[in-house]
From Swiss-Prot:
Keyword tRNA-binding assigned: no
Record-stated family: Belongs to the bacterial ribosomal protein bL32 family.
GO molecular function, one term: structural constituent of ribosome
Domain of life: Eukaryota
InterPro entries: Ribosomal_bL32, Ribosomal_bL32_plant/cyanobact, Ribosomal_zn-bd
Protein name: Large ribosomal subunit protein bL32c
Protein species of origin: Arabidopsis thaliana (Mouse-ear cress)
Assigned keywords, A-Z: Chloroplast, Plastid, Ribonucleoprotein, Ribosomal protein
GO process annotations (BP): translation
PANTHER family: 50S RIBOSOMAL PROTEIN L32, CHLOROPLASTIC, LARGE RIBOSOMAL SUBUNIT PROTEIN BL32C
One of the record's GO cellular component terms: plastid
Length: 52
């Protein structure tokens, strides 16, 4: 079984964690933006049937 030879430094660990968190932030921002545009009816990429 593969075992890491040296311990990862704290700074490298923080950098990787920050990158991982930033990806989640941008994904959630895009999802919120898409939901907002769908609810207001300004979306150009989705076709939503309006129940009247």
């Amino acid at each position: 079984m593969a075992v890491p030879k040296k311990r990862t430094s704290i700074s490298k660990k923080r950098i990787r964690k920050k990158i991982w968190k930033r990806k989640g932030y941008w994904t959630s921002l895009k999802a919120f933006s898409l939901g907002k545009s769908l609810s207001t009816g300004n979306s150009k990429s989705f076709f939503v049937q309006q129940n009247k």
